[in-house]
Structure formats: C-alpha cells, structure tokens
Design a protein with these regions (language model features):
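Divalent-metal coordination cores built from histidine and acidic residues
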Residues: 1-88, 149-152
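Short acidic, glycine/serine/threonine-rich loops at helix termini
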Residues: 6-8, 33-39, 70-74, 98-102, ...
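Divalent metal-coordination and catalytic microenvironments
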Residues: 11, 59, 122, 162, ...
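Structural motif
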Residues: 20-25, 56-60, 85-87, 107-109, ...
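Divalent metal-binding pocket/active-site signature
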Residues: 61-116, 133, 137
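Active-site-adjacent C-terminal substructures of enzyme catalytic domains
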Residues: 98, 104, 108-209, 224-230
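Active-site microenvironment of metallo-dependent hydrolases
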Residues: 170-186, 190-356
C-alpha cells in the first residue's frame, strides 16, 4: 500500500533464506477500495513479473468483493492473470447470490467466515475455509463447534491466524494452538493435523511437495512429545534440525534506504483532529469483541462547545479515530468516532498502511 513493487521485492528478498517455507501472495487490492489515498496503485501489468517466481503462489486476499461481483475491468484482469495459480479470498457478510458470483470468479479460499453457517456456504461453493484464530479475530470455536455438532466433513477446512502477536505465539503457539484447541473440542486428532498440513498445502497448490511425510515430499516435519497436546520436541526443515541451524551465522539482506523514508505528513496540527457535530446523534464505528469486522451505528455522542460550535468530546465509551494520509503529502485527514476501544487519556498512532 505504501511502496508497491519495491515493497513486494523487499519482502521476497528478505525471506529468501529463512529457515522455513515462506511463500508470497501478490496483493490484489492496492488500494483496498477506491475511497482510499494510497502510496501506489497496483494494476495487473505491475504483477506480471512475479508469475514465474516459484515462491509466488498467486493472488492475495481479494477484498474488493464489489469489484469482483460486478465484473469491474481492472479486477477481472488481475483474476485472469492468476487464473492458473491460487487466488485467496476475503469475503465477509456476502449474501448467497453474491457469494456464488464471488466463488465463480476463481477465488479458492476465504478466512473471514466467523460462523459455522457462513463457513458451510463457502464449502458448498467449492471453496476452502481457513479457520482463523489470531490475536484480534477468533473464529475457531464457533466454526469447529458446528462441525462437531453436525459431524460434518473437515476436508475443505484449514487453519490460519491472520495476525497473531508475537507474545501470543510465545504463550499459546501458532497453528499448533489451533490444532490443540480443535482436538479439545472433539475433532479426531488425525483430521485436525490434516487441516493444519496436507489440506492447507493442497489449497495453495503445494500439496505434492510439502505437507506430508511421504516419498517425494520435502523433509519438513515436527517431532512431538505428545500427539494430542501438540507438545513440540523439535522442528526439521529440509531434513535438518532448525535449532542447530539457528546457531549458524546467516547473511540478511539490507533494507533499501528509500523504503525507510515513507512517512510524509503535510501541515499536520491539532485542529485537523477536531470532529464537528451538527446533531448529537452521529454515525459511529462500532467494534465487535473478538472480531475484525465493524459495524456502522448511529448514537448520541458526548459533545462540547468550541466558539459556539458543537464538537465531539471523547470519553471512556467513545473514542476519536482519524486517518492521516502519510505518503503523498496531501494533508488529508479524516476524523470520526469509534465505540468499544476502551482507551482513556491515551493515544495510539501507528504508521502501518494495512488494508481497508
């Protein structure tokens, strides 16, 4: 979203010699929607050079669902370019008709299902469902509970985290945590391990080389002390113990200087964060605990007066949220109100240019 092809090239270079299989999907929606001010815009022609890279497996989560469903030309060119590779989805809250159109476009998977009913609809349309259990979004319990209650097949289900904080990985584990929790909820352990391994690699188009211990497969495997508790003894990559490999010195690619100088904010001042309110009932971004999806609500919000002008006043229930254009020096700032963040007398200012 900030550096375009230079950013993609940097990620590919940085992960070339890692002690693990790091594959890259090319971002499909830069910007995520037409309403955003991005550092760059990526078109299909900008993605062509990555098609022959063996570590580029396809097109990353297609989140502009409206462009897919309506057949918008630029989006169709991207989907056509990657039609012989894997195409990841990002499709929350679509109705049955739109979900069918979305699947018809060639999108192979989705990780945004947060109910068992929605996951079933995606599976019925031939899609893989990556059950997400991360730091913010936790969907595993709802989906796995439905699978267990209905004694449903797990063949089109896999695991992902979709943003899990380092401290949570250290405390809980990563995909290992998903396996453990799924077994505890009643899924057959063999099926849980298949969801984490061979079914995932089959979905991404690598099911004939990784994801199983069998002739012709890479010797990437985990040795366990306890099968059901997923208590890990050691990890092997390319047949070698990773713990021993970590002791060796390795060359790490340097970050190009121009990628370090990307935060450019023009004429920013406190006044740009003032949120003027004409009516006390105001549209608000409402957060949903345990989910990354939000909803629009209209509620009466706290106000104060500034020279007889009504302005929003944050409190323990309602916080102020702002988007500051940070790449092209446009000076654009958008302010709004958000509910459920639970911050008082503090501020957070991340520069990450995540998706929408």
């Amino acid at each position: 979203n900030v550096s375009g092809n230079d950013g993609i090239d940097y990620i590919l270079n940085q992960t070339e010699k890692t002690l693990g299989n790091v594959f890259v999907m090319i971002p499909s929606c830069v910007p995520a929607t037409s309403f955003e001010d991005n550092g760059v815009i990526l078109y299909a022609k900008d993605m062509e050079k990555y098609l022959k890279n063996p570590r580029v497996l396809g097109l990353a989560e297609v989140m502009d669902t409206r462009s897919v469903i309506t057949g918008e030309e630029s989006m169709m060119k991207k989907l056509d370019l990657f039609k012989d590779k894997n195409i990841d989805g990002h499709a929350p809250l679509l109705n049955d008709y739109d979900l069918s159109a979305y699947a018809l476009s060639g999108v192979r998977s989705d990780h945004e299902a947060y109910t068992n009913q929605y996951a079933k609809k995606e599976v019925e349309r031939g899609m893989y469902v990556f059950i997400r259990e991360g730091s913010a979004a936790k969907n595993l319990e709802a989906i796995v509970k439905g699978i267990v209650n209905e004694n449903a097949s797990t063949e089109r289900y896999c695991f992902c985290t979709d943003d899990k904080h380092i401290e949570d990985i250290i405390l809980e584990g990563h995909i290992s945590y998903n396996i453990r929790k799924t077994i505890e909820m009643g899924i057959n352990p063999i099926k849980a391990y298949k969801m984490a391994t061979i079914q995932s690699t089959q979905c991404i188009g690598k099911g004939k080389s990784i994801g199983a211990i069998a002739p012709g497969y890479k010797a990437d495997f985990v040795v366990l002390n306890d099968f059901e508790k997923v208590d890990i003894n050691s990890v092997y990559f390319n047949g070698e113990n990773v713990e021993k490999l970590l002791e060796l010195e390795r060359e790490i690619a340097a970050c190009p200087e121009h990628l370090k100088q990307t935060v450019k904010v023009k004429d920013f001042n406190r006044d740009k964060l003032i949120l003027k309110v004409k009516k006390e009932k105001f549209p608000i971004v409402n957060t949903i605990p345990g989910e990354v999806v939000t909803e629009k609500i209209v509620e009466e919000i706290p106000i104060e007066y500034n020279n007889e002008e009504k302005i929003f006043k944050a409190n323990e229930i309602y916080n102020k949220i702002a988007v500051v254009e940070r790449k092209n020096n446009t000076g654009k700032v958008g302010a709004g109100a958000i509910k459920g963040f639970g911050i008082t007398n503090d501020a957070i200012a991340p520069t990450v240019a995540h998706d929408s």
